[in-house]
């Protein structure tokens, strides 16, 4: 689950870079929303794994 979260976070960051630099100005709003959604999902995933006491998979 954490792997999926990190993968989508990377995709959102890349989309955000394109949006914030003006390459795809129309997608900037969507990229911002996706970026913050996946930041929240990453934090939730990290907290859930910490509470369960599981070590991250390599």
Curated annotation (Swiss-Prot):
Cellular localization per UniProt: Cell membrane
Transmembrane segments: 6-26, 27-47
Alphabetical UniProt keywords: Cell membrane, Membrane, Transmembrane, Transmembrane helix
Name the UniProt record assigns to this protein: UPF0391 membrane protein Sfri_4000
Family, as annotated: Belongs to the UPF0391 family.
Single GO cellular component term: plasma membrane
Membrane topology term: Multi-pass membrane protein
Pfam families per the UniProt record, alphabetical: DUF1328
């Amino acid at each position: 689950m954490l792997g999926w979260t990190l993968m989508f976070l990377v995709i959102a960051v890349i989309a955000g870079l394109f949006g914030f630099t003006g390459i795809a100005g129309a997608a900037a709003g969507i990229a911002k929303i996706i970026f913050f959604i996946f930041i929240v999902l990453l934090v939730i995933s990290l907290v859930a794994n910490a509470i369960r006491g599981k070590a991250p998979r390599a």
